[in-house]
């Protein structure tokens, strides 16, 4: 890379000043070599049932590289499954039209214990997280909030079912 395209920074952690460049460099013209191609999530095969697959073997999910649809369908199936007793989940960034929250509300309405740990300090999504937290509570879900000194920045789900008197866990 030529020296004219290098940027010297005295602090290795404070690169906020680079945000000023976003208005000067457009992805749709001028310097396409400076941008990665837009990634499109891989779609699951037709008829793919994640809820059944995770009972057979481990499945690694990587978003946004894979479609979130199988996961949402799994939550909806778990919410309707009479053997499922609870769904517990951490929520970091909730979209204004969150289908995940809709699935959790549906599960609560079906009598499942639903617990959501919500990070209210999710940059740019704080208001969505606050609004959805209220709707989750109104639906009967238990909503927990992050810790003062720590930020919840992970997506974890625990689905607990009881089959033949034994508890089974999907994480």
Task: Identify the residue ranges that each predicted region occupies.
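N-terminal localization/anchoring segments of enzymes in phospholipid and broader phosphate metabolism
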Residues: 1-171
